[in-house]
Amino acid sequence: MIGRLSGVLLEKNPPQLLVDCNGVGYEVNVPMSTFYNLPGLGDKVVLLTHLTVREDAHILFGFGTNEERNVFKQLVKITGIGARTALSILSGMSVADLAQAITMQEAGRLTKIPGIGKKTAERLLLELKGKLGADLGVAGAVATDATSDILNALLALGYSDKEAMLALKQVPAGTGVSDGIKLALKSLSKA
């Protein structure tokens, strides 16, 4: 298995990269979250990898973080979710957002990802329930009822998922709903 690549970034054609490792060029497929954080062409890059071996191809997938790679491995274990679909899921939302959607059983958030229909989203919720978070080291994946209410309030006020999640991280655990909303709004006004 190839677990890690360290080399020079030669080409970037989303979602594929070409990485030169001591004269050998590796084609690596990466999620868009990793793609956006890549250095420029000709610069050194380090990727954590997962090799998928099929009858007709060996495909290398690369990730910027261990969390992404672990979630990818969990996703490809699910019936009906192949490596390309798993890559699409990780391109469509961050690991933290995915963990939040799974924890809160929000199939609607998952169906916004291209290639994920209602049945696939429900299968993801069922198969991954309780597996994301502690097992994968995703901080804050388990939401309390208050956290859920605060998040829903921020979304109802028109904030994006990303903005709401960032604001939610500023709210201490155990904070009540009304105080949590006030703290979250205060952190959003500073941004």
Curated annotation (Swiss-Prot):
Residues 142-191 are annotated as: Domain III. Residues 1-64 are annotated as: Domain I. Residues 137-141 are annotated as: Flexible linker. SUPFAM superfamilies: DNA helicase RuvA subunit, C-terminal domain (SSF46929), Nucleic acid-binding proteins (SSF50249), RuvA domain 2-like (SSF47781). It comes from the Bacteria. The keyword Metal-binding does not apply. The RuvA-RuvB-RuvC complex processes Holliday junction (HJ) DNA during genetic recombination and DNA repair, while the RuvA-RuvB complex plays an important role in the rescue of blocked DNA replication forks via replication fork reversal (RFR). RuvA specifically binds to HJ cruciform DNA, conferring on it an open structure. The RuvB hexamer acts as an ATP-dependent pump, pulling dsDNA into and through the RuvAB complex. HJ branch migration allows RuvC to scan DNA until it finds its consensus sequence, where it cleaves and resolves the cruciform DNA. This is Holliday junction branch migration complex subunit RuvA. It comes from Janthinobacterium sp. (strain Marseille) (Minibacterium massiliensis). The lineage of its organism: Bacteria, Pseudomonadati, Pseudomonadota, Betaproteobacteria, Burkholderiales. The gene is ruvA.
